[in-house]
Structure formats: structure tokens, C-alpha cells
């Protein structure tokens, strides 16, 4: 693999995807410390919202320590060069949330849908572009469909006004060949002016390899998170990825030592538990399950006595997708009752 001379824009997820790992309980002080540290290290883009995007505050997804607006207004005025993005899932976030984010100073709106449901993004992508934002179409759980189907959905988002399309490995399921195929087809068939991005999870330990494959295939934006702070086994650990890019001659514009220090001195002490490929996170990747389901399944294990691993495998078998968190408790209860009935009949 020869990536010498390529340029890539890195996008930090630790203050959005990392919200899942923190049960959305990141304080304003922590948010500011991480964001300003990343800014000083040269990170060009930082995502800040509830883990499930703008408007995610709910019983289903979790109540954050502060509102999206409070986080955005606390952080954005303190940044010197980094720009801030906000994730928006139609059906959770609204056009009013989008306008609020832009009013706070957000420059990039990333409109996320399940990989087969790009059509629900038309209103939000169109409004974002009309209001002058850098507008990204974000196709989640992209491992579930073929490269041709990803392209079909990407073309819809592009037609609505997205200037960047993301192939998103929400489950950490993909291997490099699949990433290469999907990113390569997007790069070959979309408008040359449309940027291509990749968002990986480390559930199978493949996030760095997959991100490199994405760059080789034509991606110019890569998501990750400092210290890997994110759902499941986390996102592509950016301090590691920056080091790999430096060795391979890929220009990121990031100061390696500074981002290492943000990871070690600020983010790791914030963690409620180590972000690693444990058996439950590995099961997410192996079964192709949405990464933010991990803590929900672990809580259900404690409540109903059904191993999280078994719950996750069944969720994968049923083809559950992001937004179906409410099914996890129902499934765990059903599995618990079924096991009790088996014991009685035995």
C-alpha cells in the first residue's frame, strides 16, 4: 500500500460517539478541555452533540448532562482553528435543531440515515445546504448492503445537496477488502467534487486497517476519536492513526505529540471503563450489531441474567439497526423467560 503524498481530513468523534461510552455524561469542563486540546493539536473537525445526534435527549437514547446547545455554546467560542460538526438523524433531530446548531456556530451538518433509507434525509440535507453549511450524507450500518446499493443511496443524498458522502461501518464489521470495494465504487461513480468519507469502529480490531484502505480507495475524510473514545470498542484511535499516517507519508496536519497528550492526559482519565475489544465488543463486530447497543445489552444482562453476548448475537440475527434500542430490553426479557421455561420443563 503506497499512500505517500495523500492528504486526509481527520474528524474527531470523542465528544459525540464518545457520549455513548460515557452514557452521555460529559461535563462542560471536560467537553471544553478535550475540544481545546484537539484544537491546539491541529484537529480540523470536532463533532459535538448527544451520542444519537441533535435532539437525542430522550428516555430511549439517554439523558445527557447538558443540552446540545449548552455544549456547543460552551465550546465553539473557545476554538481557534477547529470547526465543529453536528450529527442529525431525521426522526430524532429536526430542522429547528439544525438551525439552532448553525446559530451556535456549527459549520458542518452530518445527516445520518440507515444505509437503505437515504430518502428520509432530503429535507434536512436540502435545508443544511440552503443555509450554507458543509453538508454530509452519512450512511450507517453500510456493511448490511452491497457496494452497488450503497452507491444507489449515496446518489440520492448527493442529489439532495450533500457535498460529502460517508460509508459508515457502525458495527465495526467490515474488513479492508469490503471497505476498498465500497469506497472505491463511490469515488468512481459520484461527482468528482463530492468528497468521500469513512467512519469505522474497532470492534474487530480493524478500524485503522479499514481507514487506510478507505484512503487508498479515494476517501478524503476519516473519522476517529482520540483514545478511541466511542461506542463499542470505540472508533479509530486518532493518536495511533496519526502516527501510522506519518509513517506512511499521509498528511493530516495534526501534531502527533499534542494529540497523544490529549489522549493520555485528558481523555483516558475521563473513561468510565477501558475502551477495548472485550468479548462483548468483539461480538458486536462479529455479529454486525450497531455499536451503541453495547451498554444497553450489558445493562440488560445485569437486569435479566441473560449474557450480553447472547443478546447481541440475537440482535444481529434479527438484523436490528440503529434506533431500535428499545428492542434490547424486550428481547432480554423474552430470552430470560424462555430460559426459565426451559428449566421448568426440564
Swiss-Prot record:
Substrate binds at residues 16-17, 170, 199, 290. PROSITE patterns: PYR_CT. Residues 8-260 form the Pyruvate carboxyltransferase domain. This is 4-hydroxy-2-oxovalerate aldolase. Pfam families: DmpG_comm, HMGL-like. PANTHER family: 2-ISOPROPYLMALATE SYNTHASE 1, CHLOROPLASTIC-RELATED, HOMOCITRATE SYNTHASE-RELATED. It comes from Stutzerimonas stutzeri (Pseudomonas stutzeri). Belongs to the 4-hydroxy-2-oxovalerate aldolase family.
